[in-house]
Amino acid sequence: MKKTNEKKIANKCQIFTPTNYVKELLDSVGYHKNIVNKTILENSCGDGNILVEIVNRYIEEAIELKFSNKKIKKGLENNIFGFEIDKNQFEKCICNLNLLVKKNGIQDVEWKIYNEDYLKSEVNIQFDFIVGNPPYITYSNLSQEERTFIKDKYETCRQGKFDYCYAFIEHSIKSLSSEGKMSYLIPSSIFKTVFGNKLREFMVKYIVEIKDYTKEKIFDNALVKSAIIIVDKKDCSEKIKYINMSNDDGLYICKKTIRKKWVFSNEFNIGKKRFGDYFKVSHVVATLLNKAYVINEDMYDEADEYYKVGKFMIEKDVIMPTATPRNMRYGKEEKIIFPYKYIDNQLIKYTEKEFKNLYPGAFSYLTKFKEDLIKRKSDKKSKWFEYGRTQALLGIKCEKLLISTIITDKVAVYRLDEACIPYAGMYISLRDEHQEYNFGFAKEILESENFMEYVKKVGINISGSSLRITSKDIEEFNF
């Protein structure tokens, strides 16, 4: 079982650091001068593209200092460390390092490169430098065994759905000497995601600089943007230097005033009234299998009391209008099978027998997807023909606004009536029907330049110029 888990992790770690970012990582901690007697670690080294640059810099300085090849060899063996969990990448790494030193007339180096999981290693050294690009594996892609191990060992991962790299960051900072420095290329979502809060609390006192690649796509297949964090154990600065690498804009952020979500701006959200005090922002329904419930306009023909979908006659009484921000944008209409009913605004669930008897057409249609519906990770009390998540159903029967969780260039807000059951985005409802601010005002606020500027600061950078926001982000906006 252990080997299987390690292989799965290894397969998910095969993203290597481009050369220009390798140099930026090393330059950021000053690994270019006075380095021959300093220890350095790369703890997820892949085929060695960072280690090759490290060794090259080491040899260059050693030659300048007139070191003999024998002395250089000894220095390489005593000062440069690496870990790589994948056997094939480990062997490539050793091969690449041997080719490099051979060009300089050095052979038979006994490298301190280990073919093992850094998080489970018993190597106990305090390093002068740690540089790297830790493996980025989401919580959902970790085995239960790995989740349990990491939760038990790392304080930043005790709660919530942590990412694998959180443990690497914690372990690395703890492995630095009292004057050690670290530079790590990390997903910039770490600064803002809710599950990264404990990690941010842990590392804020050590971070001295952040280089944020807000526009650049460093890794071809990665959805999130990246940043370099720079740690200096001996620097007790009360501020973090922040640089937006897309335009070289920089500022200093006071550590004492930094919030749970790290926002890199000294002028931020300065309005007097909180949006969430007047409007509630909620998640829409989650069917967990949209293809079973959603019927687009090209799929059906309308009859008196039915929608004909293929050979199925689905009863109109069990069909509701639906919407997504994307379909609203392009003017597309869709319907959704709604296997519930409301009586006096209370959600009523059917038994399987009731639903089959009342709506045999809809029941037969859903039965076509029964195998996939059963496989969903649904709420424990959800029946196979119901939506996977039911929480949103308790408050969604109301007039509302619809907004996307992904914002690109501008915010678009759509007005929906009480009957509409959206299945993507977030919906906004009134806190009080008699309050001074209505939906028209809310739409105006959310489509304003001020809100867009706010989104640019609180949103998580993903592909292109797109940003991901949460319901809490919207509620916390001050106008």
Task: Describe the residue ranges of each PLM region.
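Short, ligand-facing micro-motifs at secondary-structure edges
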Residues: K211-D212, S404-I421, E453-I462
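A short beta-sheet element
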Residues: D409-E444
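Signature of N6-adenine DNA methyltransferases within the class I
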Residues: A10-N11, I15-E24, K38, S44-V52, ...
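Conserved SAM-binding strand-loop segment of SAM-dependent methyltransferases
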Residues: I106-D117
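C-terminal substrate-recognition regions of SAM-dependent nucleic acid methyltransferases
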Residues: K8, K12, K217, A227-L401, ...
